[in-house]
Amino acid sequence: MLKKENCCLIALASVPLVMTLGNSMLIPILPTIEKKLHISSFQVSMIITIYSIVAILLIPIAGYLSDRWGRKMVMVPSLLIAAIGGAITGWVSWKVENPYIWILMGRAIQGIGAAGAMPVVIPCVGDLYKDEKQVSTGLGIIETSNTFGKVLSPILGSALAAIVWFLPFWAIPVLCVVSIVLLLVLVKAKKQEGEVPPLKEFIQSIISTFREKGRWLIAIFALGAIIMLILFGILFYLSTILESKYDIHGIWKGCVLAIPLLVLSLSSYMAGKKIGDNQNVMKKCIYIGFLMAAASVIIPLFIKGIYLLLLCLVIMGIGIGMALPCLDALITQGIEKEQRGTVTSFYSSMRFIGVAAGPPLYSFFMKGADHEVFYLTSIFAAIGAVIAIIWIKPAKDEKTVKQKPEPTS
């Protein structure tokens, strides 16, 4: 990789890191927020969900605009909006007597910013390199940054909340400003090449792409939703039972939450390095990863204990980590650059649907016994494995599209 490309990748990797911290940092403190605001478990889960719902609706628009205006022109203002949303959430938590509704409004604004930030990074990496092995490696680094944010977030969130419960909200605008500076300094805006196609022609090209590649694209969209639903649902479950069942609080709780996420991060990095441009290997990593996630929660159905549960979640982390960069690589390498931002935005929307659905869905099943949560997880993961095996069919004879190296926009 060239030095210039490395600098761009560092700046781009800061975006998922910051966006993940801004969301996942709240997971370990949700029980604390529930107590401070005197709200239900479902209501507190909506603090995560409202952010994702808004992002889901706006991500396709952001993807389209990034194809038309350039990636950087969309990401920087979006990060600024996310910073404003975080600042509003922090301020109302500090100054308003009953801030729950205002917190949801601030989180909704943060979701608007998130729609144009993290999802645009994936097509950005595809634009950056012409060698698809480098694209896979770059996407592995992006997913590693994303998952490292999940590793750091429970520790950082718990540490900040130990000072003042709403301090994690104030960390969001600070982190966004850091990422904005990196993008402005290290990423050069790309000049528009040739004429921009009319909107009608562009939409027709997207429709044509879905007609030609719809089966495997929809499969990857579904897998993206399932994998994030499982991940955020299990994190919500673990965050809750660590306090209610095992009496683990504060930074220690954050450290426990970080264990499976650290393994997930390392697994993502290794998978991104190893898969190269081999789509058959990508498919195997995806369905094996889902099978590992499905199998990991079978043992806790019969044998109880925090250590065994953590071991099983580590196995799940390995599986999810294997699958994530492969999903990114398949969708990025299979789409033309001119349509990449729009098509990958649908994939990102589906991932956010999983993020939005996970906590409230798991909250509902947590009203019963623990085994209901494990059954739910295993069923979703098994469905994901079946989808990957049946509907993802790597092309054997088609030549993969090679991209020209360009500065990222």
Region spans (language model):
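Juxtamembrane intracellular "pre-TM" segments in multi-pass secondary transporters
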Residues: 1-2, 188-219
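Extracytoplasmic gate region of multi-pass secondary transporters
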Residues: 215-257
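Helix-loop-helix hairpin linking two adjacent transmembrane segments in secondary transporters
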Residues: 141-186
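Central cavity-lining transmembrane alpha-helices of secondary-active solute carriers
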Residues: 49-63, 122, 258-270
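Conserved MFS/SLC helix-loop-helix module at the cytosolic interface between two early adjacent transmembrane helices
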Residues: 57-97
